[in-house]
Amino acid sequence: MCHGGTWAGDYVLNVIATGLSLKARGKRRRQRWVDDGRVLALGESRRSSAISVADVVASLTRDVADFPVPGVEFKDLTPLFADRRGLAAVTEALADRASGADLVAGVDARGFLVAAAVATRLEVGVLAVRKGGKLPRPVLSEEYYRAYGAATLEILAEGIEVAGRRVVIIDDVLATGGTIGATRRLLERGGANVAGAAVVVELAGLSGRAALAPLPVHSLSRL
């Protein structure tokens, strides 16, 4: 009887140990390491395998010539957002730069992807800054100019209180600064305190940062 009891106890302990081991293994597979702008491949040493977030962004960005109009080289971040480690690294890095925000503003359309992820990470809300005609009225509207023509951005004038809130603008790419500049003006018209902007990619040759000065601008990769 004593022997049988010992065997049963050992069996239960083995089952528990196996379950804990599998759980820990699953947890390790889900981990994303981001530290001071560095990303680690899973299962590799922090000391030997760290690569920069900028390198991750560059490796998963697709250059598309003459899109959406001839003469424009489009930076397609779709592969980056579809990669689980890439998205996790970008989210963590942008969240670090948006720390302290009461609200993040995501710019239509790709800015929505990263803004929502960052807002979730920071446990704050996300405000959708939409292209003209996409929101029910009343709205605040702002026209601006980009590399391939005029455009309009809008936010709701009712239903969302932005006055007095510290807001960080999140977008995928900073080019001439027209989109983020229009977003800033919209938010300030609503009474928000725009603390800065954070983007995944900055096209340094187009002087968007200078156009937005003195607004603090953070980018994960400068191309």
From Swiss-Prot:
Reaction catalysis annotation: AMP + diphosphate = 5-phospho-alpha-D-ribose 1-diphosphate + adenine
Pathway, per record: Purine metabolism; AMP biosynthesis via salvage pathway; AMP from adenine: step 1/1
Location of this chain's protein in the cell: Cytoplasm
Cellular-component GO terms for this entry: cytoplasm
Matches recorded under InterPro entries: Ade_phspho_trans, PRibTrfase_dom, PRTase-like, UPRTase/APRTase
Superkingdom of origin: Bacteria
Molecular function terms from GO: adenine binding; adenine phosphoribosyltransferase activity; AMP binding
Major location category of this protein: cytoplasm
Protein's GO biological process: adenine salvage; AMP salvage; purine ribonucleoside salvage
EC number: 2.4.2.7
This protein's UniProt keywords: Cytoplasm, Glycosyltransferase, Purine salvage, Transferase
General function of this protein: Catalyzes a salvage reaction resulting in the formation of AMP, that is energically less costly than de novo synthesis.
Family: Belongs to the purine/pyrimidine phosphoribosyltransferase family.
Assembly description: Homodimer.
Name of the protein: Adenine phosphoribosyltransferase
